Amino acid sequence: MILIGYNDAERIAIALNSLRDQSFRDIEIIAVDDCSTDSSVEVLQSAAELDPRIKVEVLSSNSGGCSAPRNRGIELATAPFIMFCDSDDTYDRHAVRNLHSAVTSMEADLVVGAAKRIVLNTGEEKIWRPELHATVQVFQGLRAEPGLLFDTISVNKIYRAEFLRENGIEFPSGLLFEDQLFTLKCFLAASRIGVIPEVVYNWNVERGTEDGSITQSRRELRNVSDRIAINQLMDAQLQSQPDLVHAKNQKFLEHELSLYLTTLFGLEEGE
């Protein structure tokens, strides 16, 4: 389990506890700090002193995104399976048990669990893409279910470490929205993709705040340019597969473009 964070001492402690409290006990926790200036490293090191399953890695300089710390976590991982967690989210207590059981029994390259999107300041909860998680399913690659392209977050999935390394799959450096390209590459390379209905990940968001996570701060120019760049890289991956390009573009129009149009028309005059 690879946990990443930057200047998020209070929330990373909660995220880390959700990993330590997993009902499946035989896990490796690699906590990668992106050169924080708050007490995040001390929080992680204190926990590591109490729990030998935790390894702490501190990057020498801040990378400005999620890719570098996640890629470093993949490099350090010795477990046969890999999962990712962000410092502002948590895992369901049985997440590892449910995902590990599925990926081994299905003989899949990766398995997708359900993510619960929680709006902290309203209490609203919603399963992300519930139509994908109605039943247990195994797909023989992405073409068998192009709708998987609507679920390109990386944190609600378990991956065979050998699968990632053999296919040279890592997060793109220097770009936000890195999950989308990473997950697409996984889906394209996988011969068997599992899906389970159980909620494995609690994805916390705060509506209407200015200090949310990277994916929540939509007005910054870099967010717009990086989202365009990621989509161009995804298009390149799908160049020879027009049927999948259609599904990817449908997801862009329904989800990402609507986010920015909503933000644009919600701006006050002068912004």
Specify the residue positions occupied by each region the protein language model found.
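Nucleotide-sugar donor-binding/catalytic module of glycosyltransferases
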Residues: 1-236, 240
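All-alpha amphipathic helical-bundle segments outside canonical DNA-binding/catalytic cores
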Residues: 242-251
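Amphipathic alpha-helical repeat scaffolds of TPR domains
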Residues: 251-262
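Membrane-interface aromatic/basic loop that binds lipid-linked glycans or pyrophosphate carriers
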Residues: 266-271
